[in-house]
Amino acid sequence: MSKAISYVQNGEILDWINDTGSDVAYRDVIPSGGRIFVAGENIKAGNTGSVNTEGVYELPTDNTTTFTTGDTLYWDATNGILTKTPTAYKAGYATATKIQADTTAMVKIDY
């Protein structure tokens, strides 16, 4: 017995319903379901908009740690920064070395 399967889309960009109760701005990080997405447009609360599910982004981090290319990174939703400390939201992996003084880091988001 086989089931009908329908191809829908590549998946790099998905439609997302903004159920956060707040407007989301273009390029905001959206933590959801254990991962992060990046808003592809302004998305008003309750509306549907596009989110990026992969790509390399420069995101904020703090100046108390270093990252090495390939390190697994997480999103600290409370502070709005990348971290190596495991959180509920896996962000991806570092695509460049981050020295301690840096306040941003490059991350490849993908799933």
Language-model region placement:
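Surface-exposed, low-hydrophobicity beta-strand/loop segments enriched in small/polar/acidic residues
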Residues: 1-111
